[in-house]
Amino acid sequence: MKYPKKVKTFCRYCGKHTLHEVERVSKGKASSLNWINRQKKRRGKVGNLGKFSKVPGGDKPTKRVNIRFRCTECKKAHHRPTWRAKRFELIER
């Protein structure tokens, strides 16, 4: 999917429509001290004595696009609900 690098949209901090710069946000480094990681580690030690096979699953074929809109006037940034796309690139318009 192609998306413009600059978009005129509403800034919730200025309270008006301004030009926003769009930037792609990468996922931060996961902390091993999070509660969910400790829970997964505990769950790994519990078995079912070989009675059932594992449920098939894995990664989805597409990832959610994370983009940040930064206002050119007040320099504050905000996010929007994301969508799924296989390819995502920012283009000049």
Curated annotation (Swiss-Prot):
Gene of this entry: rpl44e
Pfam families: Ribosomal_L44 (PF00935)
Keywords: Metal-binding, Ribonucleoprotein, Ribosomal protein, RNA-binding, rRNA-binding, Zinc, Zinc-finger
Cofactor binding note from Swiss-Prot or TrEMBL: Binds 1 zinc ion per subunit.
Coiled coil: none
PANTHER family listed in its UniProt record: 60S RIBOSOMAL PROTEIN L36A/L44
Function description: Binds to the 23S rRNA.
Segments forming C4-type zinc fingers: 11-74
Protein name: Large ribosomal subunit protein eL42
